[in-house]
C-alpha cells in the first residue's frame, strides 16, 4: 500500500526536496529562500533584499511577501515596499555596495526588484547607472518586470524588454512556473558572474498559473564558462570607477560573459529535432507553450515532427541572444519561423547572427516571405494563428495532405466570430471604497482621472475625462 505524503500548507516555502504545488507569485516568494539556502550550503553568509512597487501581474507579490514574513526572517531576507519603482531600484543598487565602506555583516546581499511595465520605464535611469556600476560577486540583482501584454489591468499593453535592452541588461524569459524558479537561480548566478543586473520577464500567463514543481537542490547546477577569460580586476562593482571604464567593461566583457554563461548552462536549447529538418521554429517563454499547443492542433507530436522535418529552438535568454547555439541550430534548415509576442526581439538578432554565414535559411516572423504581416506585434498571439503560420510553411515544404486538411480547418476557425460574453459587467468601485465619493466633482466642473482604480471614473456619471501616467495626476492642468 502506498503511503500518503504528509503535506503542509507551508511546504511551498519550507520543502527542500521533492515536488510542491504553488502559483507563480508564490514561486517568486520562494525564490530568494532557495538562493539563501544554496549560499549557506556553499559556505556563504548572505542576506536578501527585496523592494519594488506593486502592479499587475505582480499585484499580489508584496501581499504574499508579508504573509511569508517569518520565512523571510529565517533566511535573513528583508522586504521593504518602495515609495516608487525607481527609489526601490536605487535601494537595491545600494545593497550591492555592502562592504565597500568598511567591514560588512554579510558576505553579500542578493536583491529582487519588482514592478510592472510603466515602473520599468520610470526606472530606466537607475537601471542604466546600476548595470554600468555592476554587482557584488556574492550578491546579484534580479529585476522582475511585470508585463501585461493584453492590457487587462493597465493603461498600456506593455512589453518591457526593449527598456532593458537599452540599459544593456540581459533578459530571461521563463515558460511556466517551474522556470520561474530555475531561471531565477540562474539569474542570480549570472548576475554575480557577469556583474550585470538580470531581468526576469513575468507575464500573467506565468504569474497567475499554478503548477506542481520540482524543488530539488540538484535541479539547477550552475556551470561556469571555460571559454571566457575574465579581464584584470573582474567584472564586479568597484570604487572609484570612471564612467568610460564602466562603459568599456559592459560593452567588451560583461555581455560576452553573459553569452558564455548561457552557453555553459544550456539555457537556450533544442527541444525537438530530427535528422533532415527543413523548418526550424525559434521561440521563447509563453510563446513556446503556444507553439506546442499549435503543433497539437496540427496533430504534430515529437515523432510526427521528425517525419515532417520540424525542429524547435527554445530561447531562455532573449537578449543578448547567444550566437553559437542558434547558428548550429540553423544548419541545414530551409526556413526559420520566429514566434514571439509583441515587437520582434529575437527575430532581428537571429538575422544578424545568421546573415554572415555562407548558407543560411530564410528567416520570417513578424513579416512573411513577401514582406506582409504574418505574426502581429499587437495584442497577444493565439495558438490557432501560430498553427496556421506553421501549417502554411509545412505544406509548402512537404505537401503533406494531413497538414493541408488541418490548415483548412484552422483557417475556418479563424474566420468564425469571437464568442460574445453571456453578460457584460462594467467595472465599478468596491463597496465602501473612498473613490465612491472622492471622485464626484462639483456641478459644472470637469476633472481628469488618474491611473489605477480612479481610471474607472471616466465611464461613470462624473464629468471626468482623460488620465495621466503614475505620479502625473493633475499636472495636465498646467498645460
What does each model-identified segment do?
Residues 27-42, 53-66:
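N-terminal glycine-rich anion-binding loops that anchor highly charged ligand groups
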Residues 6-13, 42-46, 73-76, 92, ...:
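Generic alpha-helix detector with strongest preference for long hydrophobic helices that associate
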Residues 56-192, 203, 436-440, 446-479:
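Thiamine diphosphate
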Residues 37-44, 68-77, 98-107, 132-138, ...:
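Secondary-structure transition/capping motifs at alpha-helix termini
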Residues 40-44, 61-64, 123, 211, ...:
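Short, glycine/acidic-enriched capping/hinge loops at junctions between secondary-structure elements
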Residues 39, 45-52, 434-448:
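Carboxylate/His-rich catalytic cores and anion/metal-binding grooves
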Residues 2-31, 35, 174-429, 434-435, ...:
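Flexible, low-complexity linker and terminal segments
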Residues 47-53, 78-82, 110-115, 144-146, ...:
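Short glycine-rich or small-residue beta-strand-to-loop segments that form or flank ligand, phosphate
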